[in-house]
């Protein structure tokens, strides 16, 4: 399979999903089920893209102590493993899923310590991958301690120089700095976008205006995820609202990452904005129906896409 996409995962994680019916804080709880998956945003986006037939490489940073879990996952999913190994263990993120109360509690651990030399190694690997003719580079997730907020801005510029389009899914200072590279896709959630713009976003109108402001800064496509409220997508003068149907949630692990993968997949298919919104939302719905960072079969994704309502929004 031809390698066309690379994801960068600087702060990968072991995703532990624990099912605890009736979870109660400050009490003894019994675990009904548990599973462990190789994860982190960049890993998840790569896995989802491979699931729908793309040739994908993952570069970034992993702790050597538990890298075998990731190596097995990469081999099983057909991903190219281009990750650097660092001393120590990749962090664990725990999601406590309570199906009775329809709640998910997140426990996110700090990432492995890294430094400028490690980022240089990732950049060198990305340069080698770009030389193979990448179409897309996805920069995903938070940054570990020791890596400066400018990391994604530098990698985005590198990807641009290498002829690739750039998708960005991060938050905080890393988001603000990377926007200078004018990525082709940016997918913040409502809270992340509001924090970046310095204002609270309440209601569809404020989200639409904020997405338009971000698009006006030079971003090709802005997709703002709003949880059960759907997503607002803005590209140029166009704006749409994707409304998902009410659906049972098995786990929220990877739902946002699935939307990023759906946006990239839609771009490779040349879909218009409405169909892009429909497909990306279907990817997110598919992940919500699975335990752990997984997608259902492609035919199920197609069926989910047909359940998504897309409304055209007036230009700002």
Swiss-Prot record:
Protein name per the record: 1-phosphofructokinase
Catalytic activities: beta-D-fructose 1-phosphate + ATP = beta-D-fructose 1,6-bisphosphate + ADP + H(+)
Gene Ontology cellular component terms for the protein in this record: cytosol
Keyword Transferase: yes
Catalytic residues, chain numbering: 257 (proton acceptor)
Binding sites annotated in the UniProt record for ATP: 225-230, 256-257
Biological function: Catalyzes the ATP-dependent phosphorylation of fructose-l-phosphate to fructose-l,6-bisphosphate.
CDD domains noted in UniProt: FruK_PfkB_like
PROSITE patterns: PFKB_KINASES_1, PFKB_KINASES_2
Record family assignment: Belongs to the carbohydrate kinase PfkB family.
Molecular function terms from GO: 1-phosphofructokinase activity; ATP binding
Keyword Transferase: yes
EC number(s) reported in the record: 2.7.1.56
Stored InterPro entries: 1-PFruKinase, Carboh/pur_kinase_PfkB_CS, PfkB_dom, Ribokinase-like, Tagatose/fructose_Pkinase
Keywords: ATP-binding, Kinase, Nucleotide-binding, Transferase
Organism from which the protein derives: Rhodobacter capsulatus (Rhodopseudomonas capsulata)
Entry-linked SUPFAM superfamilies: Ribokinase-like
Pfam families: PfkB (PF00294)
């Amino acid at each position: 399979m031809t390698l066309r996409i690379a994801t960068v995962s600087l702060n990968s994680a072991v995703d532990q999903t624990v099912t605890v019916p009736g979870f109660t804080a400050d009490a003894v709880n019994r675990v009904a089920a548990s599973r462990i998956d190789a994860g982190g945003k960049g890993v998840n986006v790569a896995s989802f893209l491979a699931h729908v037939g793309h040739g994908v490489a993952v570069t970034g940073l992993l702790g050597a102590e538990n890298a075998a879990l990731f190596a097995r996952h990469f081999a099983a999913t057909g991903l190219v493993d281009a990750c650097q190994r660092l001393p120590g263990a990749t962090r664990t993120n725990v999601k406590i899923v309570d199906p009775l109360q329809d709640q998910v509690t997140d426990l996110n651990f700090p990432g492995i310590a890294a430094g400028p030399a490690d980022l240089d190694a990732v950049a060198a690997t990305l340069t080698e991958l770009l030389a193979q003719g990448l179409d897309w580079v996805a920069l995903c997730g938070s940054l570990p301690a020791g890596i400066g907020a400018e990391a994604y801005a530098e990698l985005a510029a590198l990807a641009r120089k290498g002829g690739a389009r750039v998708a960005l899914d991060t938050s905080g200072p890393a988001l603000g700095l990377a926007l200078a590279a004018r990525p082709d896709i940016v997918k913040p959630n409502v809270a992340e976008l509001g924090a970046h713009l310095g204002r609270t976003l309440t209601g569809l109108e404020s989200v639409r205006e904020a997405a338009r402001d971000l698009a006006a800064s030079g971003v090709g496509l802005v997709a703002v995820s709003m949880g059960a409220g759907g997503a607002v997508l803005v590209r140029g003068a166009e704006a749409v609202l994707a409304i998902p149907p009410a659906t049972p949630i098995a786990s929220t692990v990877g739902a946002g990452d699935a939307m990023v993968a759906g946006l990239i997949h839609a771009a490779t298919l040349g879909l218009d904005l409405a169909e892009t919104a429909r497909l990306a939302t279907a990817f997110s719905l598919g992940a919500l129906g699975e335990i752990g960072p997984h997608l259902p079969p492609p035919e199920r994704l197609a069926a989910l896409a047909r359940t998504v309502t897309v409304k055209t929004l007036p230009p700002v």
